Amino acid sequence: MIPATPSVTDRPSELATDISERLNRAISEHLLSAFAPDNTKSLRLFSAPEAAELLGVSGQFMRKVHGEGTIPEPKDVRAGRRYYSAQELWEARQILEKASRTKGRYVPGRKEGERLQVWQLMNFKGGSSKSTSTIHLAHYLALNGYRVLVVDLDPQGSLTSMCGINPEIEFDGLTVYDAIRYDDPVPFSDVIMPTYFPGLSLAPARLLLSEFETESAVNSNPDQPFFLRIRNALAQVEDQYDIVLMDSPPQLGFLTISGMAAATSLIVPLTPSMLDVSSTAQFLELAGAYMGVIEDAGAEL
């Protein structure tokens, strides 16, 4: 339980630390309750009509392939009705794809010669739904059979939390920072972890990622400048995914710019208000100027 008594310290530093500890304790208790009984985030089951729609087939076709034994029965069958887990749908896709005469009919991933798509969601404004848009887009793509990697570039770790991991309370593993730091970076594959969502992997973030901003300001490595570090990290795993989505912090710092240099497309969410539209216009003007500087430094965008 969270202590009901007020903090007794008068020192601002100790007061801030005490409030932080109380909030983290409250979050931890809430997650234990929300993700009971095994403290793991999970995905709901899908009805037979939903499963057919996601696979792009008819209900009659689903009954046919079950009757023929082409795909196995789901574990959850109630009153003659089938309910599928996302993992069962993912496995059904692979089976149907192998049996299909049309390549890509059920697993629509990259075709030979197609480059990895890297989409960065970014904006100056906090609260513009960057993280929310990233996770919903990732879920949609994974449910439709794409191999998706989400990369959390925000030290706040909101996207990481949406994937079922509280970065500052229950997670002490490797993060994006460990793969792009200047001293002894680890392979990017060591950072990536599976999520509760089949087809979706995560490169998580913690507050430590903010160190990249400080390090980039004082380091100059001509062999691997700051704006190429995320691109080079993604190149290590590009054959394992169809699409990469990057969630950016609400600023044009070194992390965001490094993500821009790696991206094939930029997505700029904004809310429909004059202040947000004005801020977005300023953001894009500054982003264009920074991209020009990166291009002049030799990067191909």
Go through the PLM ranges and name each one:
Residues 1-50, 54, 60, 64, ...:
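P-loop NTP-binding core
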